[in-house]
């Protein structure tokens, strides 16, 4: 077998493979004999059909089968011989196979990039340091009160921020109603910013029974391209205003927050402990993002187009599934194939490069994890969704799932690698409030 490789740029390779005529003839003869033994034709005993007739009736399919077999045998061998690692499947340029002649074909491939990480030790990093304050705890308690608030209908009272309004509305652009711009008995908490900027502000002060027009401009980056940047008028009819009444901070509220014993003080203590854990988690995530950002800045790399295209397809598929779960059709929001690609192209490149860099660092620095590290990641997930006997069942189920187990192993190895990179860096502590830390994450 002869193998010739032509480089067409950084990643593109044309591999021309020639299989000797002797092997071609041997396989043709073997396949012909096999077909003759199996075929049944009227007037001939089994295995006695003339070779010429076999050739006339089945020659094309036999040659196609032999060509396929020759490719399956020779292509992996050629890759191994030349030390090539292809991205995806090859694009084949096949010539028709003929008896007595060598079989030659060309496989067009893209090869995996070889990334040699640099400047990954000694990175300058900032570690957020947060001390949980009483005010942070009170903020959470306020949210608990808001979540357990009761609403009472108010007659003749002007709506204020925090009130709940029930109203009908219909939107118009250039005098024409648009799809998705109409609703009846819609319930909205004023000040929640669920609508486009300026909409809710114009509802404040309205009373039950009022009819009013709300004038807004859709943002330039609004997800429905037919509405982006356009002025709209919403005709609204207010049906009811309900004011919010917050419950007292007492033992009953503590129970609603999941603290069955110890009352208000126990609730505050539990909230404090939870915020400490949350701050630690967010701080670690923040440092991880710093590490990733610096790795990308220090290691710019080109990538094969097939690799990027595949990653974009995976990311788009995941996004579409998420929209589907929410009952949203992305096409109705103006998403096109080009929109999807533009949205994920850069993220896809970064994800691939980071994966290659991290893998290379793991290999160079001989970083390893044990089963306990994997188990810790499984436990962390199980604790979020289950307790008691069901938690044990879920854990056992996850450990039997090879694909999920590999995901946990990958997450554990990534965590260890990031921790190692942080240890090799220069870390400066920076005091932050809990609010600042969380806002930075968002």
From Swiss-Prot:
Its EC number is 5.2.1.8. Keywords: Cell cycle, Cell division, Chaperone, Cytoplasm, Isomerase, Rotamase. Gene3D superfamilies: 3.10.50.40, Trigger factor ribosome-binding domain (3.30.70.1050), Trigger factor, C-terminal domain (1.10.3120.10). One of its GO terms (molecular function) is ribosome binding. PANTHER family: TRIGGER FACTOR CHAPERONE AND PEPTIDYL-PROLYL CIS/TRANS ISOMERASE (PTHR30560), TRIGGER FACTOR-LIKE PROTEIN TIG, CHLOROPLASTIC (PTHR30560:SF3). One of its GO terms (biological process) is chaperone-mediated protein folding. One of its GO terms (cellular component) is cytoplasm. The keyword Cell inner membrane does not apply. It is found in: Cytoplasm. The keyword Cytoplasm applies. Involved in protein export. Acts as a chaperone by maintaining the newly synthesized protein in an open conformation. Functions as a peptidyl-prolyl cis-trans isomerase. It comes from the Bacteria. Consists of 3 domains; the N-terminus binds the ribosome, the middle domain has PPIase activity, while the C-terminus has intrinsic chaperone activity on its own. Pfam families: FKBP_C (PF00254), Trigger_C (PF05698), Trigger_N (PF05697). It catalyses: [protein]-peptidylproline (omega=180) = [protein]-peptidylproline (omega=0). The lineage of its organism: Bacteria, Pseudomonadati, Pseudomonadota, Alphaproteobacteria, Magnetococcales. This is Trigger factor. Residues 162-247 form the PPIase FKBP-type domain. InterPro entries: PPIase_dom_sf, PPIase_FKBP_dom, Trig_fac, Trigger_fac_C, Trigger_fac_C_sf, Trigger_fac_ribosome-bd_bac, Trigger_fac_ribosome-bd_sf, Trigger_fact/SurA_dom_sf. Belongs to the FKBP-type PPIase family. Tig subfamily. HAMAP family: Trigger_factor_Tig.
């Amino acid at each position: 077998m002869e193998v010739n490789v032509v480089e067409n740029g950084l990643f593109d390779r044309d591999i021309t493979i020639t299989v000797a005529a002797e092997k071609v003839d041997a396989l043709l003869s073997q396949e012909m004999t096999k077909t003759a033994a199996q075929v049944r034709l009227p007037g001939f005993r089994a295995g006695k059909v003339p070779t010429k007739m076999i050739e006339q009736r089945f020659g094309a399919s036999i040659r196609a089968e032999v060509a396929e077999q020759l490719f399956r045998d020779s292509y992996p061998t050629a890759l191994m011989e030349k030390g090539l690692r292809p991205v995806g499947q090859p694009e084949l340029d096949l010539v028709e196979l003929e008896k007595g002649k060598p079989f030659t074909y060309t496989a067009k491939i893209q090869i995996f990039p070889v990334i040699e990480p640099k400047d990954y030790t000694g990175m300058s990093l900032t570690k957020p340091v947060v001390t949980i304050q009483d005010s942070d705890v009170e903020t959470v308690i306020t949210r608990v009160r808001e979540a357990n608030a009761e609403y009472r209908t108010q007659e003749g009272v002007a709506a204020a921020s925090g009130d709940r309004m029930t109203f009908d509305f219909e939107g118009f652009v250039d005098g024409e109603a648009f799809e998705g711009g109409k609703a009846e008995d819609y319930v909205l908490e004023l000040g929640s910013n669920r609508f486009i900027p300026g909409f809710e502000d114009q509802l404040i002060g309205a009373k039950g029974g009022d009819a009013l027009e709300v004038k807004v401009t859709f943002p330039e980056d609004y997800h429905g391209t037919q509405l982006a940047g356009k002025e709209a008028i919403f005709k609204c009819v207010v049906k009811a205003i309900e004011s919010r009444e917050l419950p007292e901070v007492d033992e009953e509220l503590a129970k609603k927050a999941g603290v069955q014993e110890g009352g208000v003080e126990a609730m505050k203590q539990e909230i404090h402990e939870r915020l400490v854990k949350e701050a630690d988690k967010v701080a670690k995530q923040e440092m991880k993002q710093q590490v990733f950002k610096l790795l990308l800045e220090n290691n710019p790399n080109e990538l094969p187009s097939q690799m990027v295209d595949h990653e974009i397809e995976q990311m788009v598929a995941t996004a579409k599934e998420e929209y589907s779960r929410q009952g949203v059709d992305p096409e109705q929001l103006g998403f096109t194939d080009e929109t999807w690609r533009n949205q994920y192209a850069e993220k896809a490149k970064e994800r691939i490069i980071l994966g290659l860099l991290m893998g290379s660092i793991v290999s160079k620095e001989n970083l390893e994890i044990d089963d306990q590290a994997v188990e810790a990641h499984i436990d962390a997930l199980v604790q979020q969704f289950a307790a008691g006997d069901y938690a044990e069942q879920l854990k056992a189920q996850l450990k039997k799932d090879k694909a999920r187990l590999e995901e946990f192993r990958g997450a554990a190895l990534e965590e260890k690698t990031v921790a190692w990179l942080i240890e090799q860096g220069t870390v400066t502590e920076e005091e932050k409030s809990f609010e600042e830390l969380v806002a930075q994450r968002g």
